[in-house]
Structure formats: C-alpha cells, structure tokens
Amino acid sequence: MENGKMNSLIAQYPLVKDLVALKETTWFNPGTTSLAEGLPYVGLTEQDVQDAHARLSRFAPYLAKAFPETAATGGIIESELVAIPAMQKRLEKEYQQPISGQLLLKKDSHLPISGSIKARGGIYEVLAHAEKLALEAGLLTLDADYSKLLSPEFKQFFSQYSIAVGSTGNLGLSIGIMSARIGFKVTVHMSADARAWKKAKLRSHGVTVVEYEQDYGVAVEEGRKAAQSDPNCFFIDDENSRTLFLGYSVAGQRLKAQFAQQGRIVDADNPLFVYLPCGVGGGPGGVAFGLKLAFGDHVHCFFAEPTHSPCMLLGVHTGLHDQISVQDIGIDNLTAADGLAVGRASGFVGRAMERLLDGFYTLSDQTMYDMLGWLAQEEGIRLEPSALAGMAGPQRVCASVSYQQMHGFNAEQLHNATHLVWATGGGMVPEEEMNQYLAKGR
C-alpha cells in the first residue's frame, strides 16, 4: 500500500499504527449488537445448525467403527471441558492482573481423529459431501445405518471422486484423514508454514500433499485452481464455506449440555466470556455463531490473533474485510502459530459475525510460548502455540474498565463470570516437537 493511502488509513483508524508496529493490541468492538439484531446478517439459522447436528448423528455409527477412538462416545466427536485453577493463579501472578470468575479450558486440542478444532468443521464437510453423493446415486437413504459406508462397495464408489483443500496444517489433517478413510482421493495444498510432521502424517494416510513456498492464501488459490479442472473434484473452501462453518457451530449446543452437566449457569448474572484463536475465521466464527444460538446475549466472544497475522482484527476494524491483507500494511504474516498464519480474513465470516463479537486482540509468539510452558507446568496440559492465543483474553477483559462499562458489567457479575479459553490444537504434536516448544517459554 503506498504511503498516502497508508497515512489516510492510519488517520482514520489510529489502531492500525499499533498493528503495523506489531504491538500486542486489544480492540473492543463498539458495533456489537444483540443476537436478535445481529443474527439476520449471518445468513444462517438455528435450523441450519440443527441439520448439522442431525447429520453428525446419522454418521455416528459409521465414525464409531471407522475410528475406534470415537467408539466410547458412540461416534460423536467432542472434547472435554476442564477447570484450570492453577493456570488461573499463574496468569494472575505473571501479569499482576486478577482474573475475576473461573477459568476453563475447552480441549479441542485433544479431539479424536485429528487433534484439533478442525476435526469439527473439516470432518463435517467431508461427511456432508459423501452423504450428498451417496444419496444422489441412490446408494443411501437418510434412515439407513451409515456404518455400511465402510463396505468395499462404498469405498469403490467414493474412489471415483476427489477432494482438494488448502491449509496451514490442521484443516488439511482433518480433511485428509477423513477423506482417505471414506475412500476419496484427496490432495492437500500446504502453505510454507505447515509443520513437517503434519505433512508426514497425511502422507501416511495415503493423502497427496502439495507444498508451497508461499503463505496460506496461495495454497488455497492453487487448491481451488486444481479442483476447477476436474468435475469430480470437490474443493473445500476454508475462506467461504458455509458447510465448514456449520460443522463448527454444533459446538454451541454441545457446550451448553456440558455446562448443564457440570451445573454451570450462564445468564445475565453469570456471563460467559469465550476466547477463540482466529486464522482465516471459519473455526472461531462457526463456534461463536453456535455459542450465540446456545447462550444468546449472555455469551461474549473474542477472537485472538498473532501480532504478525492480525487479519480479522484489521478487516473488521477498518470495515474492509477481505479487501485488505496484513501484507498490504507491511506485516509479514510469519508466526510460530502456524494455524493462525493467515494474511487475509474470510470476507464471509467477518461480515456475518462482526456484530456478534465483543472484541479482537493480538499477542506475540513469545507470549504464546510463555503461556504454553506455564500451562504444561501448572496443569500438565500440552498444546501447540496457536492454541494458547485465547489464554491472553481473560486478563485483557478483566483489565478493561471501559469494556466493562460499555456492557454495564458490575463487580458481582464479573465475580460470577466464566472465562473459557478454546484450545484449538496440540494433542497430536510429536514429543520432540513439543519439547522444542517448551524450551522457548520463559
């Protein structure tokens, strides 16, 4: 972006200056509305989410057999919700900032099959596509036992079709493993920052991995191009997919059930704050949408991004969405948080969700490494760097009197609050890689 344009952007949005300087930044969204007011802009409804629930239930018998690690939950891919009181104390001590309320962790990092939040959206979209093809071919009815999809006849049928996706890692892992298991031919277009072990794991499942020297945006574009030339190839579009988004949104109802099970209350007097790491936006956007449908105006969602890849904060704050990239303002999009290394946000998610998000913040790679180490020490939970992005949120909210006033929170409400950090990945990181992460924390 030339200097003149850049100066006028900064004049209009002074916060951009802090982003360019790679400062850890927090922006509380003044444009937040009620769910009733914001929902129509999403273009999806409660019914769409219920359809996704129903589809995952239909596939549960299949998943329980195809992936024995899901048998205990009857083929439902869901993660634990745990309190992390020792980490809460450690954060308070390290940052000299009390966190009022209780700190919880949602362990999507340990979801079965692919060990990340992408096991929600990625797997769901592959299943939805497989179902559509099998229904159209007359091989399946909605009331059938879907475990029959494991038969050689179905494998043979699906092998005529292929799937392509562009990814920095975790989405590729989910889609690759699931597609290969169903019988699709699958190609994952990986950006430069994808971890070697993720590529190796995909190849071990018979997935074709195409590597690029450039970033996420290029990998997605190349994947899209490759798929266009083949009528039997389905491209899963992380930047625009409503199906992926709905796969993530199912988490809202599921979390509500977990809260009920644990006797946790969410209402006007007991607000819920949720902190979601954000790359292109599909995962956190879908989850936040589901949470809003489940908890209404009593849940407050925040997106967390690396200082080197603040694409969603930049897009929503300036109102330019996918018309601007972090590279346009001179930021390099290089971060250890490989799952969040995205320079241009999803225009669909930004526009759909901007009224339903309370805020956005950035944090440095070093902050992620530090918190990764503390969590391992205090709670014995090991995550990958990007999964710690949400962990910086509670301090930011508890420290901001202006945010608390904007929403009219009193001391008692904050005392009764639940702070939920969404851990997005790390459950399958190899030991030696994890030790390298741990060595970088302070």
From Swiss-Prot:
Q: Which domain of life is it from?
A: Bacteria
Instruction: Please report the name of this protein according to its UniProt entry.
Output: D-serine dehydratase
Q: Kindly list the positions at which N6-(pyridoxal phosphate)lysine occurs in this protein.
A: K118
Gene Ontology molecular function, alphabetical: D-serine ammonia-lyase activity; hydro-lyase activity; pyridoxal phosphate binding
Q: Has the keyword NAD been applied to this entry?
A: no
Which reaction is the catalytic activity of this chain? D-serine = pyruvate + NH4(+)
EC number annotated for this UniProt entry: 4.3.1.18
Transmembrane region(s): none
Which Gene Ontology biological process is one annotated for this entry?
A: D-serine catabolic process
Q: Which family does it belong to?
A: Belongs to the serine/threonine dehydratase family. DsdA subfamily.
Q: Which CDD domains match?
A: D-Ser-dehyd
Upper classification of the source organism reads:
Bacteria, Pseudomonadati, Pseudomonadota, Gammaproteobacteria, Enterobacterales
Q: Which keywords annotate this record?
A: Lyase, Pyridoxal phosphate
Subunit structure and binding partners = Monomer.
* The UniProt record lists the keyword Cell membrane: no
Q: Which cofactor does it need?
A: pyridoxal 5'-phosphate
